[in-house]
C-alpha cells in the first residue's frame, strides 16, 4: 500500500511553524487523526488513572493512589510471599468500581474459594487455564484488544511454557525460548495496552543465577524484556509471622517499589497478610496512623483523640473492626497525610533485593 512521503519545504517561502503544521497535516492524512498531537491537547496523557492495590500504604508508596491503568506491571518475589494475593486484591478493588477483570492461570493453581475471601466476585471474573505460553499470551492479546478489560492478571511468567518445549523430550535444551516468546508478546501488547487503558499484571518467580560471586544472585524468569516494558515493578517478601498468642495467623510482608515510571521509585511499605483474609487494612491503618502521629502509641496501648483503642495490636485491630466509623475517620486522616508518610517510605536503590530481576542467564532456563 502506497504511503504519502513527507515533502521538503522551502525555507524561504514558509517559516518553521507553517512547515511543522504542514508536516503534522500530512502525517494525519497518512495515518489518521490523532496519530500525532501536542501533549497538552490530551489531558488523559497527563492524568494517569489508577486502580487501588487494596493496601493503603502501597497506594501511597506508588505515588498515584494505586497501579497505573494502560501500563504493564510486574510483581515478583519468593514462593508464598503474597504475589497472587496482591494481584487478587487489585482485581477485587477494580470489580468494586464496576471494572471487568480476567485471570490467565498458567500455573493451573487458581483457588476460587480463597479469591472469594479476598473480595473477588467469581461470577464476574473471566478465568483461562491455557495449555501453552503462546496460547496464554494470545488470549491476553485478544482480551486487551477488545478494550473491555480493566485488569488482566497473568500468573505466572515462569509457567508460560513454549509449545516447542512441551512437545519436546524431557531432557531437551531450549535456551532462550521463553525469553524470545516474552519479548515478542510484549512488543505486540505494549501499544494495545495503552490504547485500551488496561492494567496488565505479570506475576513472576525468582531464580538463582549460576556462578555469581559478588552481588545478588537472584533474577526473575522470562528474560529482560519484561523489566524494560513494565512501568511498575514490585518486589514482595515475607519478613516474619503474625501471631495471635502462640498461633501463627498471618505473614508480615514487605513490598519494595523497585521501578516506577509514574512517580518516584524505591519506596518500601510493610503490611500484614492474614490467612483467609488477605491484606490487613486495619493493621496497616494502625501502623501508618502511628507513623503520621494520628494515632498515639504508649507502650502497648494505642489511642486516638484521647480514646484508648486497645492494648496490643490485635486488640486495637478488633476495636477498629467493631467501630467502622472511627476506622474510616482514621483512614481519611492517613490519606490526607499521604505526602508526609511517603517521604518516610523511601528505602533507596541499595538493598538486598536490588538485582532481583537482573539479566537472565542460561541457568535460568531450567
From Swiss-Prot:
Gene Ontology BP terms: DNA recombination; DNA repair; SOS response
Keywords recorded for this protein, A-Z: ATP-binding, Cytoplasm, DNA damage, DNA recombination, DNA repair, DNA-binding, Nucleotide-binding, SOS response
Gene3D superfamilies in alphabetical order: P-loop containing nucleotide triphosphate hydrolases (3.40.50.300)
Cellular compartments annotated: Cytoplasm
One Pfam assignment: RecA
Superkingdom: Bacteria
InterPro entries: AAA+_ATPase, DNA_recomb/repair_RecA, DNA_recomb/repair_RecA_CS, P-loop_NTPase, RecA-like_C, RecA-like_N, RecA_ATP-bd, RecA_C_sf
Ranges where the record places region Disordered: 346-366
Name under which the protein is recorded: Protein RecA
Taxonomic source organism: Rhodospirillum rubrum (strain ATCC 11170 / ATH 1.1.1 / DSM 467 / LMG 4362 / NCIMB 8255 / S1)
Amino acid at each position: 500500500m502506497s504511503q504519502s512521503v513527507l515533502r521538503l519545504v522551502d525555507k524561504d517561502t514558509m517559516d518553521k511553524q507553517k512547515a511543522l503544521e504542514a508536516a503534522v497535516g500530512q502525517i494525519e492524512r497518512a495515518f489518521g487523526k490523532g496519530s500525532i498531537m501536542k501533549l497538552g491537547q490530551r489531558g488523559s496523557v497527563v492524568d494517569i488513572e489508577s486502580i487501588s492495590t487494596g493496601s493503603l500504604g502501597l497506594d501511597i508508596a506508588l505515588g498515584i493512589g494505586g497501579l497505573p491503568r494502560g501500563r504493564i506491571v510486574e510483581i515478583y518475589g519468593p514462593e508464598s510471599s503474597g504475589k497472587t494475593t496482591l494481584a487478587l486484591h487489585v482485581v477485587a478493588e477494580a470489580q468494586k468500581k464496576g471494572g471487568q477483570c480476567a485471570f490467565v492461570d498458567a500455573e493451573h493453581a487458581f483457588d476460587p474459594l480463597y479469591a472469594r475471601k479476598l473480595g473477588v466476585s467469581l461470577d464476574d471474573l473471566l478465568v483461562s487455564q491455557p495449555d501453552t505460553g503462546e496460547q496464554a499470551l494470545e488470549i491476553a492479546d485478544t482480551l486487551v484488544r477488545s478494550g473491555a478489560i480493566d485488569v488482566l492478571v497473568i500468573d505466572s511468567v515462569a509457567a508460560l511454557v513454549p509449545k516447542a518445549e512441551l512437545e519436546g523430550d524431557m531432557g531437551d535444551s531450549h535456551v532462550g525460548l521463553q525469553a524470545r516468546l516474552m519479548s515478542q508478546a510484549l512488543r505486540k501488547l505494549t501499544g494495545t495496552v495503552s490504547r485500551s487503558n488496561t492494567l496488565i499484571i505479570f506475576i513472576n518467580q525468582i531464580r538463582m543465577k549460576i556462578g555469581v560471586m559478588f552481588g545478588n544472585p537472584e533474577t526473575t524468569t522470562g528474560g529482560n524484556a519484561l523489566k524494560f516494558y513494565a512501568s511498575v515493578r514490585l518486589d514482595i517478601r515475607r519478613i516474619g509471622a503474625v501471631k495471635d498468642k502462640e498461633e501463627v495467623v498471618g505473614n508480615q510482608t514487605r513490598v519494595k517499589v523497585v521501578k516506577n515510571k509514574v512517580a518516584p521509585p524505591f519506596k518500601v511499605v510493610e503490611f500484614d497478610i492474614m490467612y483467609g483474609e488477605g491484606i490487613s487494612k486495619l493493621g496497616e491503618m494502625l501502623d501508618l496512623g502511628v507513623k503520621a502521629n494520628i494515632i498515639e502509641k504508649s507502650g502497648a496501648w494505642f489511642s486516638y483523640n484521647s480514646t484508648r483503642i486497645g492494648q496490643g495490636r490485635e486488640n486495637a485491630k478488633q476495636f477498629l473492626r467493631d467501630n467502622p466509623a472511627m476506622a474510616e475517620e482514621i483512614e481519611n486522616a492517613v490519606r490526607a497525610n499521604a505526602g508526609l508518610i511517603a517521604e518516610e517510605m523511601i528505602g533507596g536503590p541499595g538493598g538486598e533485593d536490588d538485582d532481583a530481576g537482573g539479566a537472565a542467564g542460561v541457568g535460568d532456563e531450567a
